[in-house]
Amino acid sequence: MADADLANIVTTRRDESMGWLQSIVSKGLGWARKYSLFTYPYATACCGMEYMSVAASRHDISRFGAEFPRFSPRQADLLMVVGTINLKQAPILKRVYEQMAEPKWVVAFGVCASSGGFYDNYAVLQGIDRIIPVDVYIPGCPPRPEQVLDGLMLLQDKIGNQVHRIAEREEANPTAARHNLLLSMNK
């Protein structure tokens, strides 16, 4: 084979390649997740009033699939951090994020959640992205409902463009691994 022929060969790892059926399923899962967001509002300050107005009939967040807030992080896939987070609340917020099931997304709602706002002191966390990853930042003090809907549509576009896999590889059973180790030691 000539060197020119070798340059035309494309190699991929089997784990990274996606078949036709899996790509169709991924698009279907993306569409379903995009329009069925289960939100967990973590409201701590004045932005909470604007968050409630987004759910009112004038702006109607339910047409974007984020209708009912969940009151347990284990049932939610979208964490809406609404308002100022102080340093005493930071471990609680991180724990809430860790309790959420995969896939999960985070929206920083307002300037205080995004960058600490005008509370630049020792007690306020200067942006929630210091402790948890943030997918969408919604600016404003407080942000208008229209901005919130724009941020939600940005998140929906991001979710729709992601690759969604049905199931990841299963991890080895630790009990079975220990049993196999004990059996090999007895030989």
From Swiss-Prot:
Cofactor requirement: [4Fe-4S] cluster
Gene3D superfamilies: 3.40.50.12280
Keywords: 4Fe-4S, Cell inner membrane, Cell membrane, Iron, Iron-sulfur, Membrane, Metal-binding, NAD, Quinone, Translocase, Transport, Ubiquinone
InterPro entries given in the database record: NADH_UbQ_OxRdtase-like_20kDa (IPR006137), NADH_UQ_OxRdtase_20Kd_su (IPR006138)
UniProt entry tagged with the keyword Cell inner membrane: yes
Gene Ontology CC: one annotated term: plasma membrane
Predominant place of localization: membrane
Annotated compartments: Cell inner membrane
Pfam family of the protein (one): Oxidored_q6
Top-level enzyme category: translocase
Cofactor binding, note field: Binds 1 [4Fe-4S] cluster.
Superkingdom to which the source organism belongs: Bacteria
Topology of this chain in the membrane: Peripheral membrane protein
Binding site for [4Fe-4S] cluster: C46, C47, C112, C141
Entry GO MF terms: 4 iron, 4 sulfur cluster binding; iron ion binding; NADH dehydrogenase (ubiquinone) activity; NADH:ubiquinone reductase (non-electrogenic) activity; quinone binding
Enzyme Commission identifier(s): 7.1.1.-
GO biological process: one example: electron transport coupled proton transport
Catalytic reactions of this protein: a quinone + NADH + 5 H(+)(in) = a quinol + NAD(+) + 4 H(+)(out)
Subunit text: NDH-1 is composed of 14 different subunits. Subunits NuoB, C, D, E, F, and G constitute the peripheral sector of the complex.
Functional note: NDH-1 shuttles electrons from NADH, via FMN and iron-sulfur (Fe-S) centers, to quinones in the respiratory chain. The immediate electron acceptor for the enzyme in this species is believed to be ubiquinone. Couples the redox reaction to proton translocation (for every two electrons transferred, four hydrogen ions are translocated across the cytoplasmic membrane), and thus conserves the redox energy in a proton gradient.
Family per similarity comment: Belongs to the complex I 20 kDa subunit family.
Listed name of the protein: NADH-quinone oxidoreductase subunit B
The species this protein was found in: Myxococcus xanthus (strain DK1622)
Phylogenetic classification of the source organism: Bacteria, Pseudomonadati, Myxococcota, Myxococcia, Myxococcales
Gene: nuoB
